[in-house]
Amino acid sequence: MAKKKKDTKHTRLCEATGAWATKVLEDFRASGNDSYVFEQQLTNSERGIIHQMCRTMGLRSKSNGSGEERRLSLFKGDGISKSDKRRMYEARNQKEKEGDGISKSYSKHRYETRFQKAGGIRKTRISPKKLKCVSFPPEAKAVLHDLFTRYPPCDGDTTGTSLGIYTTGNVNSNWKDDFFKKPHMTKHDIENNVVSLSSRLKKERHFREIFEARSKLPIASFRDAIISAVESNQVVLIAGETGCGKTTQVPQYLLDHMWHSKKEACKIICTQPRRISAISVSDRISWERGETIGRTVGYKVRLQSEGGRESSVVFCTNGILLRVLIGKGVNSSVPDITHIIVDEIHERDSYSDFMLMILRDLLPSNPHLRLILMSATLDAERFSEYFGGCPVVRVPGFTYPVRTFFLDDALSVLNSDKNSHLLSAVKRDFKDEDKVSLDEAIDLAWTNDEFDCLVDLVSSEGSHEAYNYQNSTTGLTPLMVFAGKGRVSDVCKLLSVGADCTLKSKEGITALELAEKENQFETAQIIREHAGNIQSNSQQAQDLLDKYMATIKPEEVDVGLIVKLMKKICSDSKDGAILVFLPGWEEISKTKEKLLDDRFFAHSAKFIILCLHSRVPAEEQKKVFNRPPRGCRKIVLATNIAESAVTIDDVVYVIDSGRMKEKSYDPYNDVSTLQSSWVSKANAKQRAGRAGRCQAGICYHLYSKLRAASLPEYRVPEVMRMPVDELCLQVKMLDPNCNVNDFLQKLMDPPVAQSIENALIILKDIGALTPEEELTELGQKFGQLPVHPRISKMIYFAILVNCLDPALILACAADEKDPFTMPLSPGDRKKAAAAKHELASLYGDHSDHLATVAAFQCWKNAKASGQAKEFCSKYFISQVVMKRLDDLCRKLQGELNRHGVIPSSSSNCSLNAHDPGILRAVIAVGLYPMLGRMCPLSKNRTRSVIETIAGAKVRVPSLSNNVDMSSTKFDEALIVFDEITRGDWGVVIRSCTVLPTIPVLLFSREIAVSTTESYDAVKSDDEEDHKVGNVGDAMDIDKEVGRPGEKIMLGPENSVKVVVDRWLPFKVTAFEIAQMYILRERLMASILFKVKHPKENLPPHLGASMYAIASVLSYDSLAQSSVQTVAVQPITSVVDATSPRDDIPSTNPNELREHDPNTTPMGSKLELANKLGLGNMEESLPSNFADGNEQPDPNTSPVEDVSAATKQKKMQSESKRCKSLNNVDLGNIEENFGNMEENPPSDLAIGNEQTLPKLASNLDMGNMEENTPSDLANGNEKTEPNSANSMDLGNMEENTPSDLANGNKKKEPKSVSKLDLGSEKVSIPSNLVNGNEQHDLNIAPGEDASAAKQPEKKRSRSKKRKSGNNLDLGKMEKSKPSDLANENEQTEPKSANNLDLGNMKENTPSDLANENEQTELRLPNNSDYGNMEESLPLNLANGDEQPDPTTAPMEAAKQPKKKRSRSKKCKSVNNLDLGNMEENKPSDLANGNEQKDPESVNRLDPGKEKESIPSNLVSGNEQPDSNTAPAKKPKKKKRKLANNFDSVNNMEEKMPSTNVLSQGNKSGLIEEKPSIPSDQ
């Protein structure tokens, strides 16, 4: 322990080594070298320092050798060159192809796969434990079954979707934006403007004062020189010190010159690196010209602008101008621009550097264009050389002298009672005339012994410049003169105020040597003693510094030292504002808190403490420019934003922490870094210059002189320390045929090759570039939108699944600060975490992104009720960020509309905005490939840890909702996150969201398939898998004889191993992975279609596929939530912030059910969400409210148990309204059947209307007076749906909707003779149970259908209706309700004679568990339907509404026996009069119910067909033979709980959240082999 303490002390003392090592490491990281070896012999302690620094900076370090030969080596990433990685990859690929049994990749294209960034080729090692099984939920299987029956896989699925055959779009398409066009101004208009300006100058006193102040700026005397240089040269560089006035005056000089001298209109574009600068400067210039913003001067920043074409001067950010140059095309954007001013080029942001490269290439072909570069640092020569030696106009700054102290001096100041360090801050400037006077006084004193003048000057100046001034001719100083002349008192005085006794004259002698030469022994002795004291003091200062450095960490800001220094300044001086430079918001908050806790600064009348940060509202930021009242000192705590972007003119004292938060990118490890780093010398100079605005100032640099000497000259250019994926895309848009790497080498400082390679991989992953690096139409569209390319893809996907609003929120939030604030006290932190969890729980919890979406929705609702401030306070949310997000979302939506991506009315674009499954999928698209999986828990770990694709282990941030996912059910859960950040606290991920597996399979880059151990007879489940690190690049199935993968896909139920992105293994059935592949292809095809044709409908097969994808995502989320739902304790006091009522339900599932028994459990939860502030559910929920009827949300999963008492209350529950696949709004089932709406589908792009295909030709519904529901409870009447003629059914099975579980049987009905349909299968519509009503499918528009309100009716009049080809279906006399409970009988209909229906299979419900049987039904002959693609069993005609067929059978409540009702007369197919069908009863029995077989009938008279079975029987209902008298009632069987029901929730069957119109078959598995193209 003692040794460790000694080493630590030594490490802290050796600051010189730390400063030197920091410089070496930073230079190495900025270089293009892959390795570096220290040639110096380092001690163990020094090597320890460097090893620790390397870990922080993401570098690898290793020591080799022994003794004097021991050397320390540094490496970037894994130390393996890219060429070696490529050879390793090819060798591994060849090995895999030759004999490891891996089938080739399911991807048809060659992807350039991202390799492990910190370990070369990833050696995927599958855990010996069983693979995680992945399967579609039963409801999703039914949807997929319907999809692939109607639109089976074919070659057209991949046509146009392969990245290799994308067509390059017109990258120079016209973008109609006249903001950068030259104003329409005649010479007369220009003269009027000049006269108006002159008139105001004469008449308005305020305007004259402004003009006079402008004329006193340092740059005013250089006006003519600047104008002349601009007229004579195409490029001019103005190097002006901060405060000279270049930013505000140069644009006005150019404007006035064009108007006054040339009488010409002009368009002057001025770029700024920051939004705040562009807006504030344009506002300042407008004020100086006596105008309002938006007239002569305007601005345009991202999603915000003032002014337009008539603005002659436009301020914008660098990114805006860059987008204009690229987006509009170089041939159409430049001619209207006369001048481009690029300000603050020394900041070297990536957009600025890239734009300068483009402009340099444009200048030769645009001789009219003038480019003015402006910089505030000494790096002007380099920029001049970059533009071929352009002229430089140097403008001095208008600042007073500033004295600088370093940490060594500051510590001495704090230990001293004197205030001599403040003397220079109260004296006037040392000017040229003072220098002339001193020259004369020194000459007179030395030659004529006239000392009075020199003594007076030195005393009056009182500055170090005067004390140490050297004569311009002789080099003598006042101290030398007084020492050589023996003036002891003057020598003592000069030495006491800091005169330097080490200076030498031009003859090379010091004051001491001159005194000895002149035999002035007394003064010589005084100087000799003083020099000894200085050395002693210097040693004391060094000792003091060493002791201080031993107690702190140099990389951390010492807030306590800053407070002590401010107290010292305020005690020794009376006025002058103090500006403190700090790295970030955390340090600002800590400093402010410490100041307020100190009694010295607690008096608000004496001190005003202000913060200058991007998180601070604009109104608060403006206060820093106001001068405080007399007797009050202003203290400003700021980041580097105060270096050059803003100027505070009353600052006298500057405290520089020497640190700055800088975001950078490590391309070798593919990790972003946000660390506090040391400033550059240029930054330090800028900060010191802030102190000399109004008088002489002082700057305290809180780092040593040794550290100051080791600082880099300038900051590393942003293009070298940030990802360049956006720049690479812009390069391809500018020149589609160029090589990106070669193009970027033209930059002043090009990025490293590894960074460019990483960017190209991302662009290929999202489809913006082909594998050959060609620009795709998808990439062209991504580049036009004002968001990151990944965000662009997320927006397009969100539009396709009707989930736009959350996507806009997430897109805008990606570039903003976290809306959730971080309280300082532990108690408040716990409350903030609970509040965030409560918001996220509205969408299933375990997501930081969904918490942001919920917070924004709740805030908008609270804002509408005037409670936004209270809501933000109680939920620890930044109202500033919320307002900002609201503004950005509105503007981004306008931009999308302007680009034609969405229609002007986008109210229907967010019908699925509250579906958790679809929301998580949208997040996955926007964040991919930032994917990881949760590591299993360990005893010593308290925080969640994520494993990335590179094999790195990163932590979840402390404020994340997923920080403490301690349950083992989250082991290996998949996580998507914003980015990996290496900070001072370690390597963490940013905001993250837990994902189900199916979205990952859908959106991943590639999926590879191999056999599982269970398929191999040699291996067991417990054996380790073979390596899957590198698989083939084609998605073809290996069919060579003898190969292990020969029969992978031949059996649909065979289990296969699927490896996602070459590192995530899962176990899936061969049939389901085949379906997944087709869905992937159709998803990409849908996005491409939407990009090319944003205002057109998707083709039918793509529309149906997007609907199916949305349904799968929704059902999968419901299945996941039923397993992983975690109760969140509500914050009662917080809830009141948005809803002061007392009836707000808790988030506890049981309480939700008790709150409203008539809603689905998730419906109650969404009701809670609505009351908490989720806005108008009628506008956003996928299921709509029709005619004022309330309706529970069908898009959510039941998550609570439904008690028997609750079920009894639901005798007649509200039916659900659902959108069908083909955009038909089925309306409310119980009421209001008159007006049927056609709404945009939840799966198709907004604005596309698509109606249901007609299933019957010339359907005539006849005059139907009463159409009661198809499934009636409590004795309600019911009619039979129409059949359709000439329908191509394809290979359709008859799928009943209910699920038979726990040993339920369904016996085979007897077949009818001579029945042959050609393997045709029929799908029976699903029904509503538990007293839910279902209206007739063919009900006429406007007809009242209130059968549910007539439980006492026994009989109703028969109705005559027509079916396909005007066929009379005869009379149906008796129609029993479809859902009969408690041993009600029901018979089957007789089949008609001579109908050739072929082999038609009747499939039992979707999930047949425990030996459920599946039977075959033969239907009458001579009615050949052919292959029908449209398999929807429910028809809509003449505006008839259709009940929701996706409603699953629920547990029936106890109901009284129902009497028989008269059935209706209906027509069948092919002109056959089916006669009187007496009894129509349900077709399916659930929970142990038996169904008897119908007797076979030969050549039955179609005139009297009896009993057509609509749907279901539940809860012990029997079904007798359809062709005999009702059978004897069997004993009532005890109902069993279905296996597939959630054991915790014990609820109704889950409903889809995408308005799913699914078939009754829930299995989703086609019994035949999957129809997959041979090339798949």
UniProtKB/Swiss-Prot annotation:
GO terms for molecular function: ATP binding; ATP hydrolysis activity; DNA binding; DNA helicase activity; RNA binding; RNA helicase activity. Pfam families: DEAD, HA2_C, HA2_N, Helicase_C, OB_NTP_bind, R3H. A motif (PH2) lies at residues 1454-1465. GO terms for biological process: DNA metabolic process. Keywords: ATP-binding, DNA-binding, Helicase, Hydrolase, Nucleotide-binding, Nucleus, Repeat, RNA-binding. Residues 1137-1165, 1177-1223, 1260-1576 are annotated as: Disordered. Residues 1305-1319, 1490-1508 have a biased composition (Basic and acidic residues). Residues 561-735 form the Helicase C-terminal domain. Homodimer. This is DExH-box ATP-dependent RNA helicase DExH2. The lineage of its organism: Eukaryota, Viridiplantae, Streptophyta, Embryophyta, Tracheophyta.
